[in-house]
Each structure stands twice: as C-alpha cells, then as structure tokens.
UniProtKB/Swiss-Prot annotation:
Protein keywords: ATP-binding, Cytoplasm, DNA damage, DNA recombination, DNA repair, DNA-binding, Hydrolase, Nucleotide-binding
Key word Transcription regulation present: no
Domain notes: Has 3 domains, the large (RuvB-L) and small ATPase (RuvB-S) domains and the C-terminal head (RuvB-H) domain. The head domain binds DNA, while the ATPase domains jointly bind ATP, ADP or are empty depending on the state of the subunit in the translocation cycle. During a single DNA translocation step the structure of each domain remains the same, but their relative positions change.
Name assigned to this protein: Holliday junction branch migration complex subunit RuvB
The encoding gene: ruvB
GO BP, sorted A to Z: DNA recombination; DNA repair
Length: 332
C-alpha cells in the first residue's frame, strides 16, 4: 500500500495534475526565484528570435518540474515534446525524437539522470551545435551520417542532479532549483484546487492542510481529495478546520506533516541508537526500507524540517525530534 505522503505520482494523479496545470508564469504559484529568472530569459530569447538556452530543473518529486516545462513552452509559444530517461533506451530512440522537432520547439526529458550513457553522448552535439552524427549499418558496410537539427530547447528534469555527468550538466545554460513550497503558497494552491473542482473549503482548513503537506503541491492535492471524502461522509460537505484535523489524524498525518514511516525512523534513531549518529544503511535495515528510499523519499523532508542532521559519523536526531515525539532530550 502506498503512503499517502508519497511525493511520487499515484493512480489518476497525472490526469488531475494536467487539469490543474497553469498555462503561464503569472499563473504559477510559488517558486518565485525560478520564475523571475525564467521570465527574463524567455523574454530575451523571444526578442532575439532565438531558441531559449537549455534548462535543467532539479528538486524533489511533486514540486512542479513538469508543470514548469509546459509553462516555459507556452510562454515561448512553441510545441513541447515529452519523454523520459528510462524510455530512451538507445541512441536511435533519441534520434527519432530529435528529428520530429521544429525550430524553437521544447524537448522535455523527465528523469534525465536515467539516460544511458550511449544516449547521453548523442545529446552533447545536439545541445551544443544542433547536429548529430550517427552510424548507419554494421561492420564494413557501416557509414556515418551527419544530421543538422533545428535550434531547440532541451528541458531536463531530475530529482538527483548529482547523478548527472559533468559534460551533460555543463551544457545547460539555465538551472532552476525547485524548492519545497512556503506555507502561504501551498495554502493558495489548495484553495485554487478546491475552486477548480468546486469544493467548499475554509481558509483555516486550507492553511491546516497546507501545513501538513510537506511543502509539496502533489501531496496537498492528494490530501485535499481525501479530506473531501471525510467532509461528505462525516460532515455537511464543507471542508473546515475541524474535519480537516480529524481526517488527517485518521490518515496518520501529524501537524508537522510526518506519517508513521517518518516517526518510525525518528523513534528507531532515538530508542535503539540514543539519537545517533547512525549510518544510513543500518537505519534502512532497521525500518525495513531500501537505502535509496530512505535517502530520497524520507530524509530530505526530515532534514529540511530540522528533525535530523547529517554528520560525518551518520544521522543524528535533533532536540526537535525528541520534543515532537515526547521524549526527554539531553545534550551529548
């Protein structure tokens, strides 16, 4: 069973996110630093009648990287071709996609860190000089074919920027770090979603829901759907702060946005290792989760909220973690 606080996409959420997707930067809530920079770069590219420099968007899942890619294409007034790293298995797959691009188009590659190296190497000349050299045939009859490409913009999205090779990363002229959303921005997103789907919600309820959504719009919208169910069955259909608190408590989402897995991580560190330091591998074994899952899905939010710290010796539970779970904390 999936966690309700999982920031990866679930079920019909892709369709829901397309419905909610803003079209232009002025409609995009949050990520102001990235938006402000992109606004300037896009306007400058349009004034020069050039393709926008290649863009790398990185950050945790669910923060709007795909949405931002579509917004960029809309702002430029061009078509967007969407694919993902795992789908492009060989160089020929990429060549077929590149051949379909029109001048100025946007090619969006999600999970770009998962591109095979053989495919990535084809991208280098395509990104830098808008051409590719490919080998046709095999053995003695093989020959090299030079293909010119129209100027285009590659937008790469990744949750693991550190896994990108240096040559690929260096070819992105624009980088945007997508960060967890501020409480006020997330509250506005919840209210916008409720309005689009004609849900009646109070501002206090939207604020409480945003507070417990881990700074992530995808999670906020998922929780909103579940709280709506509670409001229909246990109330009069109106989503207020009382029904929101009751629903999220029943869903094991506390006031800091932690669920049972997050709490299990913290309790394990405190009860079994006196708060740490404890190695990530050891911690993963104790909570029966993959090391990568802990590192990518759970740890970033716990660090961002100040519940754990990374040290040279391992992970350490903070005084805030002790206090939140009701343990007595003493300085080491």
């Amino acid at each position: 069973m999936s966690r309700i606080l999982d920031n990866e996409i679930m079920g019909d959420e892709e369709l829901v996110e397309r419905t909610l997707r803003p079209q232009y930067l002025r409609e995009y809530i949050g990520q102001d630093k990235v938006k402000d920079q992109l606004q300037i770069f896009i306007e400058a590219a349009k004034m020069r009648d050039e393709a926008l420099d290649h863009v790398l968007l990185f950050g945790p899942p669910g923060l709007g990287k795909t949405t931002m890619a579509f917004v960029i294409a809309n702002e430029l007034g061009v078509n967007l071709k969407q694919t993902s790293g795992p789908v492009i298995e060989k160089a020929g797959d990429l060549v077929a996609i590149l051949n379909e691009l029109e001048p100025g188009d946007v090619l969006f590659i999600d999970e770009i860190h998962r591109l095979p190296m053989s495919v990535e190497e084809v991208l280098y000349s395509a990104m830098e000089d808008f051409y590719i050299d490919i080998m046709i045939g095999a053995g003695e009859g093989s020959r090299s074919v030079h293909l010119e490409l129209p100027p285009f913009t590659l937008i790469g999205a990744t949750t693991r920027a550190g896994m990108l090779s240096n040559p690929l990363r260096a070819r992105f002229g624009i980088t945007g770090h997508m960060e967890y959303y501020a409480h006020a921005d997330l509250t506005e997103i919840v209210e916008r979603t409720a309005d689009i789907f004609e849900m009646e919600i109070t501002h206090e309820a939207a604020s409480e829901l945003a507070l417990r959504s881990r700074g992530t719009p995808r999670i906020a919208n998922r929780l909103l759907k579940r709280v709506r169910d509670f409001a229909q069955i246990m109330g009069n259909g109106v989503i207020d702060d009382i029904i929101t608190d009751k629903a999220l408590t029943m869903l094991d989402v506390d006031h800091e946005g932690l669920d049972y897995v997050d709490q299990k991580i913290l309790r394990t560190m405190i009860e079994m290792y006196s708060g740490g330091p404890v190695g990530l591998g050891t911690l993963s074994v104790n909570i029966a989760e993959e090391r990568e899952t802990v590192e990518d899905m759970y740890e970033p939010y716990l660090i961002q909220k100040g519940f754990i710290m990374r040290t040279r010796s391992g992970r350490v539970a903070t005084a805030k973690a002790y206090e939140h779970l009701g343990y007595e904390y003493s300085e080491k």
